[in-house]
């Protein structure tokens, strides 16, 4: 999009501080706000980018998982304050230990959706392009994440501490 990209109606009244998470009530409220934001992203992808509904849904589902399973309930972090390190810690540690069968196919969908969301937010001047570029770069570190998954399955004896320390939460 161009620097003069229009601010879509959903984002016009958006206040970043509304996404702060300091209590359980905040978590519930922010969770709902994220659902609304992701619905808007879905519409953007289908209507303005010409993406097929199934693909747009997959992208939104990926971003949804990152935000509503990790950023909000685990980190209690405002989604507008997310940095590339958060995505690295999610994909290189949290996802692996929290998923019964962690795999790169599923993880790639989450990473792609998350990058799509942050690119959209940057186009609307809601996050910096620098942050978005770093998140996108991190989302493309698939060899690193595959190695983290493989190394996790290869842990023996006291090896978990070494694995954990390589990408701590």
What are the language-model segments listed below?
Residues 120, 140-149, 166-167:
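Eukaryote-specific, cytoplasm-facing alpha-helical/coiled-coil scaffolding segments in long proteins
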Residues 123-145:
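Short, charged hinge/linker segments at domain and secondary-structure junctions
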Residues 13-73:
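N-terminal "first-domain core" detector
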Residues 46-54, 72-77, 156-169:
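Eukaryotic Ca2+-signaling machinery
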Residues 100-109, 144-162:
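Charged/polar, low-hydrophobicity segments characteristic of intrinsically disordered regions
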Residues 1-4, 8:
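Preference for solvent-exposed, low-hydrophobicity sequence contexts
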Residues 15-18, 22-29, 149-169:
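Eukaryotic low-complexity, intrinsically disordered regulatory segments enriched in serine, proline
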Residues 49-123:
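Non-catalytic DNA-binding core/recognition domains of DNA-processing enzymes
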């Amino acid at each position: 999009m161009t620097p003069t990209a229009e601010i879509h109606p959903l984002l016009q009244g958006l206040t970043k501080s509304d996404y702060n998470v300091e209590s359980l009530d905040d978590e519930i409220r922010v969770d709902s706000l994220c659902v609304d934001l992701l619905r808007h992203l879905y519409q953007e992808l289908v209507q303005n980018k010409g993406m097929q509904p199934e693909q747009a849904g997959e992208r939104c589902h990926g971003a949804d998982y990152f935000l509503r399973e990790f950023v909000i309930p685990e980190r209690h972090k405002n989604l507008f304050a997310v940095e590339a390190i958060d995505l690295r810690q999610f994909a290189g540690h949290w996802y692996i230990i929290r998923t019964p069968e962690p795999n790169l196919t599923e993880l790639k969908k989450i990473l792609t959706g998350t990058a799509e969301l942050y690119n959209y937010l940057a186009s609307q001047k809601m996050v910096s392009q620098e942050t978005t570029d770093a998140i996108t770069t991190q989302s493309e570190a698939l060899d690193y994440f595959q190695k983290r998954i493989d190394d996790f399955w290869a842990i023996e004896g006291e090896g978990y501490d070494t694995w954990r320390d390589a990408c701590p939460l």
